[in-house]
Amino acid sequence: MYYEFDDDNIKSSTDKLISSNKIRKNPLFYGPYKVSKVVRGQSVSWVPNEHYYKGKPHLKKITASVITPASVAQSIKSNKFDVTQVSNSQWPNIKGTKGVNFIANIPLSYSYLGFKVGKWDAAKGENVMNKDAKMNNRSLRQAIAYGMNVDQVYKRYSSGLSFRIPTLIPKQFGDYFDKNVKGYTYNIKKGNELLDKAGYKKKGTYRVQPNGKPLTIHLAAMSGSKVQEPIIQNYIQQWKKMGLNVKLTGGRLMEMNSFYDKVQNDSKDVDMFIGAWSLSSEPSPQDLYSAKAPFNYSRFVTKENTDLLNDIDSQKAFNNSYRVKKFHQWQAYMDKEAYVVPVANSYNIYAINNKLTGYSLEPSKSMGGGFPNWYYVGYAK
């Protein structure tokens, strides 16, 4: 038995569905609430879904509004909203606010520094590594990692609510996390030693490549909160202390869409980049770092990496101790090679009106991903 599909008809039907009222105006909802009103770019209102299998939820209406980051602190102080996500840099200004409870969780996510060492081959559906790429030198990558004073940065700019992480497998994954991998702590001296031994000699202020050519490294980084600019400029200054000439791609921080357009398309003016991942509950890194993963933005491909990733997802990995062992080996390998260097994770903090009940981020009482189960959320009179 076989099935034959008309790709053109499927695409036509899909395009029509995407723009149809069934999707845009009157979609089906299976949760406790359904959308009642959308003000484009401003707010979305939700009302109880009369078809929800558990029955009627406790709130008559929920309105989610978009506000600027600069107005978050004042909106919390004035109790304008019942639920507000707090930027860590704003915590000192709002932590004593009356009438609210603060709750937090550590999400399955992390930021990282990636080094471009190849291209994505769309025709073959695979990453192709360039052995002659500027950043395809392990000592250079390790030195750059040692030049990041992550602990100092987040102590100053996030009140300690963001923190350095040592591996690409978060601690929340239990035994799969390798506590013996320590990552790269700030060490300018060690970075300089690595560069010296690798032949990156100083000529004036900056170092040159081992072949004697000038070395300019272009860093792509996203814009964000008001502390993002000083954080990135700090790293650039730390690297300068090591004699590395690092410049921002395009001369400035980029908004998210422009950033990922350049990173995904392997733009020539990106040598390294600071990105971030939100992870699923399955810890396998196959979809982010394998040879055929489009999300492997560094484009590194090695036999050892491929073998370890395949082992992690193999039939043998049904034996948990075997899978734990392979996860640990992979983390140690990635730490050594430094194609992708884990940087930090952060607490997600929410300011909650103290009259709200049932709002919880505990796994057993929430929808996961930092979202409560709104069916249980109510308002105390």
Describe the role of every protein-language-model region.
Residues V47-Y52, S109-S139, R156, V181:
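A bilobed periplasmic-binding-protein/Venus flytrap-type ligand-binding module shared by bacterial periplasmic
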Residues Q42-S43, E50, A145-D178, V227-Q237, ...:
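Detector for C-terminal structural segments
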Residues G31-S36, S43-S45, K60-V66, S111, ...:
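Short, well-ordered beta-strand elements
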Residues N93-S109, L113-V117, P283-N296, N354-Y359:
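Ligand-binding "clamshell"
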Residues N21-R24, N49-I94, N245:
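Ligand-site clamp/hinge motif
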Residues V47, D132-Q237, K241, Q329:
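Append "and occasionally in soluble cytosolic enzymes with long acidic Gly/Pro-rich linkers
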Residues A70-F81, P92-T97, Q233-M242, M256-V270:
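Short helices/loops that flank or line small-molecule/ion binding pockets
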Residues M1-K54, K61, I188:
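Gly/Pro-rich hinge or "lid" segments in bacterial periplasmic/extracellular proteins
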